[in-house]
């Protein structure tokens, strides 16, 4: 299976904006792209503002909301914690079984995780274990500001310790008037981590299909990305 797994150095770093934008960009380049975000917490998958809805709209996939996100919980917490509150536990086998049912419906897939790669999804597995099982290269979405060097470095080193391939890093949310840390962090992260920076993307005032697509077109190196992940 061709594609990649989008994770982050933290929650709310812009994984879904980047994932959906890349899906739209691949679609724009005549790729038959699917999306899979197995876990969602804190909002209905059918809500127009949900991550699932944005991924579906931007990728133009025929997959249903339930196909894209089979496991949804009410509380805005880590999936394992939110699931326990509802008396639901999702096993790794269930995640992979659902993946097996949808993976052949598209030529390539963008899979999005929940939070960072150490977030617990079930009783005995983390996001990192799902990435390893799917055997897709990772794209790490990171913050631009102070502290991101440490967060990104730790994410990269943990991924490497798990034997997870990393396609690259996207620094998301640069302000209109970047501070010195925002200007210097991308180069420092690339040098310390030994992983290519695929793009540095601005903070969007309004998230729409048009603004997200323009953002990824203008600020992400698509040719480098496609070479890295084989799509």
Curated annotation (Swiss-Prot):
<dbReference type="GO" id="GO:0004141">
    <property type="term" value="F:dethiobiotin synthase activity"/>
</dbReference>
<comment type="function">
    <text>Catalyzes a mechanistically unusual reaction, the ATP-dependent insertion of CO2 between the N7 and N8 nitrogen atoms of 7,8-diaminopelargonic acid (DAPA, also called 7,8-diammoniononanoate) to form a ureido ring.</text>
</comment>
<dbReference type="InterPro" id="IPR004472">
    <property type="entry name" value="DTB_synth_BioD"/>
</dbReference>
<dbReference type="GO" id="GO:0000287">
    <property type="term" value="F:magnesium ion binding"/>
</dbReference>
<dbReference type="InterPro" id="IPR027417">
    <property type="entry name" value="P-loop_NTPase"/>
</dbReference>
<feature type="active site">
    <location>
        <position position="37"/>
    </location>
</feature>
<feature type="binding site">
    <location>
        <position position="51"/>
    </location>
    <ligand>
        <name>ATP</name>
    </ligand>
</feature>
<keyword id="KW-0093">Biotin biosynthesis</keyword>
<feature type="binding site">
    <location>
        <begin position="12"/>
        <end position="17"/>
    </location>
    <ligand>
        <name>ATP</name>
    </ligand>
</feature>
<feature type="binding site">
    <location>
        <begin position="202"/>
        <end position="204"/>
    </location>
    <ligand>
        <name>ATP</name>
    </ligand>
</feature>
<feature type="binding site">
    <location>
        <position position="41"/>
    </location>
    <ligand>
        <name>substrate</name>
    </ligand>
</feature>
<comment type="pathway">
    <text>Cofactor biosynthesis; biotin biosynthesis; biotin from 7,8-diaminononanoate: step 1/2.</text>
</comment>
<keyword id="KW-0067">ATP-binding</keyword>
<feature type="binding site">
    <location>
        <begin position="112"/>
        <end position="115"/>
    </location>
    <ligand>
        <name>ATP</name>
    </ligand>
</feature>
<dbReference type="GO" id="GO:0005829">
    <property type="term" value="C:cytosol"/>
</dbReference>
<comment type="subunit">
    <text>Homodimer.</text>
</comment>
<protein>
    <recommendedName>
        <fullName>ATP-dependent dethiobiotin synthetase BioD</fullName>
        <ecNumber>6.3.3.3</ecNumber>
    </recommendedName>
</protein>
<keyword id="KW-0479">Metal-binding</keyword>
<feature type="binding site">
    <location>
        <position position="112"/>
    </location>
    <ligand>
        <name>Mg(2+)</name>
    </ligand>
</feature>
<dbReference type="GO" id="GO:0009102">
    <property type="term" value="P:biotin biosynthetic process"/>
</dbReference>
<keyword id="KW-0436">Ligase</keyword>
<keyword id="KW-0547">Nucleotide-binding</keyword>
<dbReference type="Pfam" id="PF13500">
    <property type="entry name" value="AAA_26"/>
</dbReference>
<feature type="binding site">
    <location>
        <position position="51"/>
    </location>
    <ligand>
        <name>Mg(2+)</name>
    </ligand>
</feature>
<dbReference type="GO" id="GO:0005524">
    <property type="term" value="F:ATP binding"/>
</dbReference>
<comment type="similarity">
    <text>Belongs to the dethiobiotin synthetase family.</text>
</comment>
<keyword id="KW-0460">Magnesium</keyword>
<feature type="binding site">
    <location>
        <position position="16"/>
    </location>
    <ligand>
        <name>Mg(2+)</name>
    </ligand>
</feature>
<keyword id="KW-0963">Cytoplasm</keyword>
